[in-house]
Amino acid sequence: MVLTNSKQPRKQRKALYNAPLHLRNSVMSAMLAKELKEKYAKNSLPVKKGDTVKVLRGNFKGIEGEVSKVDYAGYKIIVEGVVNKKQDGNETAYPIHPSNVMITKLDESDEKRFKNSSN
């Protein structure tokens, strides 16, 4: 998906910030694990609710959990088990950018998701 044909970083950023929600899906892609790359002949796929991902970067590196929410407006995903502890003891979900995770298990309930893949 191309949001803009411009090479200028400022125009690319502006296109990213002003992109409609139905086009933000392809920007929210994460790399696939080795087995999934071989199975689907793709390097990355858009993250969906129900996928299992492993965090590769940041303070939560190494944690594996299921995606519980995809925030297209903020370009972030919420992963179960990735929580911030607040001062009063409560835990809040910590949003992560999809480029910092790897999909280890796909939610295969959506048949349309794989209709164009080789398998």
UniProtKB/Swiss-Prot annotation:
GO terms for molecular function: rRNA binding; structural constituent of ribosome. PROSITE patterns: RIBOSOMAL_L24. It holds the Pfam family KOW. One of its GO terms (cellular component) is large ribosomal subunit. Keywords: Ribonucleoprotein, Ribosomal protein, RNA-binding, rRNA-binding. GO terms for biological process: translation. Belongs to the universal ribosomal protein uL24 family. One of two assembly initiator proteins, it binds directly to the 5'-end of the 23S rRNA, where it nucleates assembly of the 50S subunit. Located at the polypeptide exit tunnel on the outside of the subunit. NCBIfam families: rplX_A_E. This is Large ribosomal subunit protein uL24. It comes from Methanococcus maripaludis (strain DSM 14266 / JCM 13030 / NBRC 101832 / S2 / LL).
